[in-house]
Amino acid sequence: MNPLIAASSVIAAGLAIGLAAIGPGVGQGTVAGNAVEGIARQPEAEGKIRGTLLLSFAFMESLTIYGLVVALALLFANPFVGA
């Protein structure tokens, strides 16, 4: 295995998971804060807000999981390594 390809793959895997976690992390914090504000303003809508909140958390977390899959593929099933 070419050392340059190996080093580039490790750096790319680290960037993939790191950058894939930043966006959803910021988004989840923002959404949770807005949900708390919404529940404080309208306590009777708590169930509807909570359901929407959990669904949006699942969509945001899927982006992080996709980044993890890309990182694992770069580390263990690297398509750039010659056979």
UniProtKB/Swiss-Prot annotation:
UniProt keyword annotations, A-Z: ATP synthesis, CF(0), Chloroplast, Hydrogen ion transport, Ion transport, Lipid-binding, Membrane, Plastid, Thylakoid, Transmembrane, Transmembrane helix, Transport
Pfam family, one: ATP-synt_C
Assembly and binders: F-type ATPases have 2 components, F(1) - the catalytic core - and F(0) - the membrane proton channel. F(1) has five subunits: alpha(3), beta(3), gamma(1), delta(1), epsilon(1). F(0) has four main subunits: a(1), b(1), b'(1) and c(10-14). The alpha and beta chains form an alternating ring which encloses part of the gamma chain. F(1) is attached to F(0) by a central stalk formed by the gamma and epsilon chains, while a peripheral stalk is formed by the delta, b and b' chains.
Note: In plastids the F-type ATPase is also known as CF(1)CF(0).
Membrane association type: Multi-pass membrane protein
General function of this protein: F(1)F(0) ATP synthase produces ATP from ADP in the presence of a proton or sodium gradient. F-type ATPases consist of two structural domains, F(1) containing the extramembraneous catalytic core and F(0) containing the membrane proton channel, linked together by a central stalk and a peripheral stalk. During catalysis, ATP synthesis in the catalytic domain of F(1) is coupled via a rotary mechanism of the central stalk subunits to proton translocation. Key component of the F(0) channel; it plays a direct role in translocation across the membrane. A homomeric c-ring of between 10-14 subunits forms the central stalk rotor element with the F(1) delta and epsilon subunits.
Listed transmembrane segments: 3-23, 57-77
Species of the source: Oedogonium cardiacum (Filamentous green alga)
MF (Gene Ontology): lipid binding; proton-transporting ATP synthase activity, rotational mechanism
Family: Belongs to the ATPase C chain family.
Major localisation: plastid
PROSITE patterns xrefs: ATPASE_C
Record-annotated site: Reversibly protonated during proton transport: 61
Location of the protein in the cell: Plastid, Chloroplast thylakoid membrane
Keyword Transmembrane helix: yes
Record's GO cellular component terms: chloroplast thylakoid membrane; proton-transporting ATP synthase complex; proton-transporting two-sector ATPase complex, proton-transporting domain
Cross-referenced PANTHER family: ATP SYNTHASE LIPID-BINDING PROTEIN, MITOCHONDRIAL, ATPASE PROTEIN 9
Protein name: ATP synthase subunit c, chloroplastic
